[in-house]
Amino acid sequence: MRNKQAQWAVLKRLLSYLKPYSLLTFLALAFLLATTVIKSVIPLVASHFIDQFLNNLNQLAVTVLLAYYGLYILQTIVQYVGNLLFARVSYSIVRDIRRDAFANMEKLGMSYFDKTPAGSIVSRLTNDTETISDMFSGILSSFISAVFIFVTTLYTMLVLDYRLTALVLLFLPLIFLLVNLYRKKSIKVIEKTRSLLSDINSKLAENIEGIRIIQAFNQEKRLQEEFDEINQEHLVYANRSVALDSLFLRPAMSLLKLLGYAVLMAYFGYRGLYLGITAGTMYAFIQYINRLFDPLIEVTQNFSTLQTSMVSAGRVFALIDESNYEPVQENGQFKIQEGNIRFEHVSFSYDGEHQILDDISFTVNKGETIAFVGHTGSGKSSIINVLMRFYEFQSGRVLLDGVDIREYSQEELRKNIGLVLQDPFLYHGTIKSNIAMYQDISDDQVKAAAEFVDADSFIQDLPLGYDAPVSERGSSFSTGQRQLLAFARTVASQPKILILDEATANIDSETEALVQNSLAKMRQGRTTIAIAHRLSTIQDANCIYVLDKGRIIESGTHEELLALGGTYYKMYSLQAGALS
């Protein structure tokens, strides 16, 4: 954003969003031009009154005065309508930009979200787009208005007296020099200020998400200090921006305007009578200097907001242009019929350097359950990420019903895989909408899904039943209740493949019995892959795979692995000892 070419590219792209609103923009510009013309005529009427009627008041003088005030009223009305039209165009464009940014964000792969703080993304979709709105609603209209006013005022001044106009024009190079100097000085400061604001949002989001852990480990003071450090740095750069505005904007421009008055008055006093310059003409010129300088002062003041808008637009367009998408699917016509899964020598790395999965091979068919166990970082969840196509694997093959997983459309793949996570996510809405997940299913189907996983009993105990409100992340429900709702959501979607990513890890022993009963029913007739921390929950699996550093080091049934006396045996013994 620091070179002119990049800034022009951003501006050109911003202006391209005007295309769908060409008619509305044309009307706004027409009202803006009408306002400018009226503003240019008003000093002429005043000049005529001073020269012709100041010492000779009559009926015509009253008519001229009424015309003078009538023009002011008309200017106010026309300007108001023009501002409304510009505001409508502005908010429509911001809606479109925000929609494009959100649409692209939804298509991005998990790797983008792994490396990009949530607060930074939120900042781009909220703060930065609002700044763009300021540009279209205020800055763009003021820039165009300044051009209209400059041209019409300059023409009128030349018609009135070319000599006085020449004197005024001597100040224009100084004005443009001042504006250019401000632009160069401010861009770096503004970029840094916006970046720090994004950091503040990221830090806030992180602290709000982890407030329980922060308080549990007495980390309030440390995180307060970290936040204060970023906040203080933002204050420093914000003050620098204000200092630049205070120096280069209104004070300097106002000084030039006053200097213009002085030169004009001196010239009028020295040569005015000799050259036949009337008092009315002089009054008109003073008004025109105001009309010439005031828009330029406003434009210069808006340069700060313009620079901020350009930086913000660059950040939003970076999100719109982000191409770190989910792995590519062929959008083929294949349909998942059974849900049989086969991994053939699959290797995977998140960063292309450190191998997370190394030569993984296994098979699981409809009606079977397999489980993956291992220490943290062994690669269990990475297998799920590969199967869900959240990430692209580097080598090997993944087959579904004998067809390469890449040959299925993303929609076909996702609708046939039911994913239940360790920490179930509930959306703001109702219990019904969370189970249905906005699919076109009936209330009876929602209730049947809840009954199937034994969630109906606690739902019916709620005052509003299935219409009971769900707060953000479902914080008003217990962990077990949230998990049962997640199970009901999965059953309602009727997937052929079920993935359980430590689905019972956070549930107490009493609730676990209820959940295990629900899981047993869910697994019937489905291909099931379970990632387990509690080994007691996967003892009935058809095959258990033990992972270590991305490789399968043991496999077999629960009894076979215990008899082997290897890693699984040690893990099971440790858990059994802890329980006893």
Q: Model regions: which residues?
A:
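Juxtamembrane loop-to-helix connectors within ABC transporter transmembrane domains
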Residues: 10, 18, 86, 94, ...
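Helix-loop-helix
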Residues: 57, 64, 156-170, 244-314, ...
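An intracellular "coupling" helix at the cytosolic face of ABC transporter transmembrane type-1 domains
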Residues: 20, 110-111, 127-136, 140, ...
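Transmembrane helices of ABC transporter permease
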Residues: 20, 24-37, 45-48, 68-71, ...
